[in-house]
From Swiss-Prot:
GO terms, biological process: mRNA processing; RNA splicing; tRNA processing
Statement: the UniProt record of this protein carries the keyword ATP-binding: no
Keywords, alphabetical: Chloroplast, mRNA processing, Plastid, RNA-binding, tRNA processing
Official protein name in the record: Maturase K
Function summary: Usually encoded in the trnK tRNA gene intron. Probably assists in splicing its own and other chloroplast group II introns.
Gene behind the chain: matK
GO cellular component, one term: chloroplast
Localization in the cell: Plastid, Chloroplast
Source organism of this protein record: Trifolium microcephalum (Small-head clover)
């Protein structure tokens, strides 16, 4: 956070609160590189980090200074107008720079707002993607209906830029952003396709996520406003609302429209038990009351996306299901509400009664089939789940190979320790353990049995199963019953900020 303050103060000293001069500063790209280098990863994946150098950045900035966008000759028709030629590497560097620069003022506003609200200490826990599961455990057992909604895209580029302009008041910066997106990312078509969106999100992930999150934040602000207006009990949210141009004018317009055109239908939206959860590109809407209200909110979402954001969404893609009969996928987990039935014997005077008690419990399990599919894609096993060797890593030392497998196993165990049933997690550990042994045997050109007998690596490879117990023994008392109880129960780690690379949430 202090780094952002320093860089913004440098820009303010040269220009009056403008962000665009930071695009031409070398330290911005160095900051983007350090963020990518220090990011927590689960599977090693070489990117442009290995190609980064200060010399490449200097050449890039020089070309950006010298480029004249008003003069494009016929000989340059096959070249990129932004830099003179097509180069995905330079595109990724520039997009990282744009993302870093535009994030600076929001980090400063967010930090100041958190300091005023005095929630700095708990902010890291609130940032955890697993902080949503304790909320679901408390609330969803009392609800009856759920709707799993995929937030639609693509959205036109101009709408994304206009939404961002409500927050950042810097016209030259947005001119540069438009030039980059239109010419370098080939977003000059009238209606962008899903293929172009997918290509842009993979080659420029940080900038794409930043723009996409602003689109989601905009529609959620309208949804929250209408939700508060639909019931007399106002919701209190810890979210930070930043200053935006025309926001209050838009609110007044919405109030006027709803008071005139929807004065009779608005009372039907009064549902105090509706809950909304968003994760990645999906959201979950759950309610305790009849599905009629859920159906109302479904069509509200569809009309909101179509009328305000020009995004087409089909009503049949949003299904309303009974929570006790439907399982939904959330952050790599399968979740549903399970009914537990128990019989209690009650005696009154000389009469004995059998009373059946039904209780609800949120069941969260590891989806073994999608996870095995992800492991097979990463070449740790085949499609049937049989472990195979990893010949690509055979050039590394034995210690590095074991450490790589242990890191992946540790991260998966850390991520899926909130599962209700640990059997699937043990199977994943078993696949990684045998894949590690086969990789070491392949390196030494030996069979698995001969390698284990010769090297005696069984004790070292036991770390795949014993490490989690050692961590729990440091947290809880060294009582076998206590450790066994916590080993069976769910434990949510609130230091997880990113989704695991092997998690398939499709």
């Amino acid at each position: 956070m202090k780094e952002y303050r320093v860089y913004l103060e440098r820009a303010r000293s040269r220009q009056q609160d403008f962000l665009y001069p930071l695009i031409f500063r070398e330290y911005i790209y160095g900051l983007a590189y350090s963020h990518n280098f220090n990011k927590s990863i689960f599977v090693e994946n070489g990117g442009y980090d290995n190609k980064y150098s200060l010399l490449n950045v200097k050449r890039l900035i020089t070309r950006m200074y010298q480029q004249n966008h008003l003069i494009i000759s016929a000989n340059d028709s096959n070249k990129n107008p932004f830099l003179g030629y097509n180069n995905n590497f330079y595109s990724q560097i520039i997009s990282e720079g744009f993302a870093i620069v535009v994030e600076i003022p929001f980090f400063l506003q967010l930090s100041s707002s958190l300091e005023e609200a005095e929630i700095i200490k708990s902010y890291k826990n609130l940032r955890s993607i697993h902080s949503v599961f304790p909320f679901l455990e408390d609330k969803f057992t009392y609800l009856n209906y759920v709707s799993d909604i995929r937030i639609p895209y693509p959205i036109h580029l101009e709408i994304l830029v206009q939404i961002l302009r409500y927050w950042v008041k810097d016209v030259p910066f947005f001119h540069l952003l438009r030039v980059f997106l239109y010419h370098f990312c080939n977003w000059n078509c009238f209606i962008p396709t899903k293929k172009s969106i997918s290509t842009f999100s993979k080659s420029n992930p940080r900038l794409f996520l930043f723009l996409y999150n602003f689109y989601v934040c905009e529609y959620e602000s309208i949804f929250l406003f209408l939700r508060n207006k639909s019931y007399h009990l106002r919701l209190k949210s810890f979210s930070v609302f930043f200053e935006r141009i025309f926001f209050y004018a838009k609110r007044e317009h919405l109030v006027e429209v709803f008071s005139k055109d929807f004065s009779y239908t608005l009372p039907f939206f009064k549902d105090p038990n509706i809950h909304y959860v968003r994760y990645q590109g999906k959201c979950i809407l759950a309610s305790k009351n009849v599905p009629f209200l859920m159906n109302k909110w479904k069509y509200y979402f569809i009309h909101l996306w179509q009328c305000f954001f020009d995004v087409w969404s089909q009503p049949r893609t949003i299904n309303i299901n009974q929570l006790s009969e439907h399982s939904f996928q959330l952050l790599g987990y399968f979740s549903n509400v399970r009914l537990n039935r128990s019989v209690v014997r009650s005696q009154m005077l000389e009469n004995t009664f059998l009373i059946e008690i039904v209780s609800k419990k949120l069941d969260i399990i590891v989806p073994i089939i999608p996870l095995i599919r992800s492991l097979a894609k990463a070449k740790f096993c085949n499609v049937l789940g049989h472990p195979i060797s990893k010949p690509v890593w055979a050039d590394s030392s034995d210690f590095d190979i074991i450490e790589r497998f242990l890191r992946i196993c540790r991260n998966l165990s850390h991520y899926y320790n909130g599962s209700s049933k640990k059997k699937s997690l043990y199977r994943i550990k078993y696949i990684l353990r045998l894949s590690c042994i086969k990789t070491l045997a392949c390196k030494h050109k030996s069979t698995v049995r001969a390698f284990l007998k010769r090297s005696g690596s069984e004790e070292l490879l036991e770390e795949f199963f014993t490490e989690e117990e050692e961590i729990l023994s440091l947290i809880f008392p060294r009582d076998s019953f206590t450790l066994h109880r916590f080993h069976r129960n769910r434990i949510w780690y609130l230091d997880i900020l990113f989704s695991n690379d092997l998690v398939n949430d499709e």
